[in-house]
Amino acid sequence: MNASRASFSAWQTYLKERSPLPVIATIGLLQSLSSNYLFRQELDGAGILMSTACLTFLFILMRLMDEIKDHQKDRIAHPERPLPRGLIAPAQMRSAIQVLIGGLLAVGALLFLLRSPESGAALVFTVGYSLLMYKEFFCPAFINKNAFFYAFSHQLILIPMYVFSVAMVSPEAAFTARTLWFSLTGLGASFAFEVCRKLDPDAHPILRTYLALHGRTACVLVIVLALGLLSVSAWQIGVQNLIWPAVGLLILFLPLVYFRPERFKLIEAASAFVGLVQLLSVTVDHFL
């Protein structure tokens, strides 16, 4: 019993530090709400709640997978994290990954049969893609040749995730052009944040950040390209009036990469704001 309590406490600590439930559940909820209002005027409460729950567990699953993949690097660069410091053993984490995969696949099958084939298929596909990411697409040497290519291959999972959240409330519209553009707003915002959060000029070399591997100009160029994708996609679904000012704000901070690189946290914060606006945009536009 004491061992069970200790294990439960360890997982509580892990979630608090690496996958804070209030944060990731809020992200899932905001995505689900915007997915609802992308095609609907009324609120599908049950669909939104189920979508939020599934997205939350997907976020937890992908974080666990990253913890395992980054274990050796974290032992050197981030020994304070749960896995390197021994709070949870790698075997326990792998077991949790297996349980989550099995549970999400079972939910996907039930959704396919009881909710809509589109939602179930999208969830199963997303879980399958996360497995490919976990295994680095069975060609780790190839996808690790370029850090940006590696990141992009992993960011692509957002497309089926957005298709899933739309399919939960509007299954007939899950595979339409509007849904694709909506998912591309998520991809653009997320990819920009992914690069912006790894601009620390003093990061440990073993972390192989985008800045260390490719330099400042390449990082800025990729961020601008991601923001371009976000901006065009936002225009396609009619939320550019909300998205473009946030994009402009982030662009104003980008010169810090050259002139005040130690202020990289400001760029990260601005990119997080862009991500928040993207998540809220369709919902806010609905009520304007």
Provide a role label for each language-model segment.
Residues 1-68, 95, 138-145, 154-157, ...:
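Topogenic membrane-insertion module of multi-pass membrane proteins
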Residues 4-12, 140-143, 218, 242-288:
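Extended hydrophobic alpha-helices typical of membrane-associated regions
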Residues 7-12, 16, 92-170:
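Intramembrane alpha-helical segments
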Residues 27-33, 84-87, 148-167, 211-221, ...:
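Small-residue-rich segments of transmembrane alpha-helices in multi-pass membrane proteins
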Residues 28-37, 101-110, 124-131, 158-163, ...:
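Hydrophobic core of alpha-helical transmembrane segments in multi-pass integral membrane proteins
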Residues 34-52, 105-121, 160-184, 232-241, ...:
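Helix-coil boundary and interhelical linker segments in multi-pass alpha-helical membrane proteins
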Residues 56-67, 127-139, 159-164, 182-203, ...:
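Transmembrane alpha-helical segments that form the membrane-embedded catalytic/substrate-channel core
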Residues 63-102, 187-231:
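Solvent-exposed interhelical
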